[in-house]
């Protein structure tokens, strides 16, 4: 049994396997449950970056909602889905499939300005939904081929859009950025907190939930 503290008598459900998104929510004091949200991330040709991340975030949130309801979750619980992409010269860079693709991405990013878009979607089982996107400009310093290979050898680029993680060793590749840092990591927390507040979920009005065998129930409130 896991005890979860959340505001407004509802649960926040993160439809993502990303440890970075979980870390960002935890750092802001939110408690939540995580569910898998496996969706195809194949994008149609010619789609804009903002439309791409908003669409994928919404699909992830809806997949997470279906999974949550199938496990007995409340229709009033809030499901959060997100997706992050890197855009360089109007080309969308996703997660590298292998080290060779990671090398190509990092070589292209070297000495250039790129843009990180994260789409954020909130849905519940009562039919309410919304999605938005946040963009941050990131300026890479010029990298040597040796630096690129050394970074790839750390294994860090494997599961990250654009083949780098600004919160880890990849931070040394960045000269500076303009906008939200948490957006580059995977979840724009300034935006997320504002939208959750609109949905009536904050860190006050606490209710105690128990999750047993995947089935949530309210135990009591303060």
From Swiss-Prot:
What highest taxon heads this organism's lineage? Bacteria
- The site feature described as Important for substrate specificity is recorded at 20, 84, 167
The record ties this protein, via Gene3D superfamilies, to:
3.90.950.10
Single Gene Ontology BP term?
Answer: nucleotide metabolic process
Against Pfam families, the record matches this protein to: Maf (PF02545)
One molecular function GO term is: UTP diphosphatase activity
User: Which CDD domains did the record assign?
Assistant: Maf
Identify one Gene Ontology CC term for this UniProt entry: cytoplasm
Query: Which cofactor is essential here?
Result: a divalent metal cation
List the catalytic activities from the record.
Answer: dTTP + H2O = dTMP + diphosphate + H(+); UTP + H2O = UMP + diphosphate + H(+)
Q: Which UniProt keywords apply?
A: Cytoplasm, Hydrolase, Nucleotide metabolism
Q: Does the keyword Ion transport apply?
A: no
Task: Report the function annotation for this chain.
Answer: Nucleoside triphosphate pyrophosphatase that hydrolyzes dTTP and UTP. May have a dual role in cell division arrest and in preventing the incorporation of modified nucleotides into cellular nucleic acids.
Q: Which family does it belong to?
A: Belongs to the Maf family. YhdE subfamily.
Q: What is this protein called?
A: dTTP/UTP pyrophosphatase
Recorded source organism is Desulfitobacterium hafniense (strain Y51)
The top of its lineage is: Bacteria, Bacillati, Bacillota, Clostridia, Eubacteriales
């Amino acid at each position: 049994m896991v005890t979860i503290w959340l505001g407004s008598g509802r649960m926040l459900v993160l439809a993502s396997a990303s440890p970075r998104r979980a870390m960002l929510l935890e750092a802001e004091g939110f408690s939540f449950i995580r569910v898998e949200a496996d969706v195809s991330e194949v994008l149609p040709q010619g789609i804009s970056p903002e439309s791409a991340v908003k669409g994928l975030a919404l699909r992830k949130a809806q997949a997470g909602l279906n999974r949550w309801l199938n496990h007995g979750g409340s229709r009033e619980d809030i499901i959060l889905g997100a997706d992050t992409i890197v855009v360089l010269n109007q080309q969308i860079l996703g997660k590298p499939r292998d080290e060779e693709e990671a090398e190509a991405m990092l070589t292209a990013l070297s000495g250039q300005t790129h843009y990180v878009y994260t789409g954020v979607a909130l849905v519940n089982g009562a039919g309410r939904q919304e999605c938005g996107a946040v963009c941050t400009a990131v300026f890479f310093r010029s990298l040597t081929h040796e630096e690129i290979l050394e970074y790839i050898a750390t294994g860090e680029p494997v599961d990250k859009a654009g083949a780098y993680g600004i919160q880890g060793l990849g931070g040394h590749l960045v000269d500076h950025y303009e906008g939200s840092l948490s957006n580059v990591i995977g979840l724009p927390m300034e935006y997320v907190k504002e939208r959750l507040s609109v949905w009536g979920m904050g860190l006050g009005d606490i209710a105690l939930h128990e999750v047993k065998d995947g089935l949530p129930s309210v135990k009591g409130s303060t």
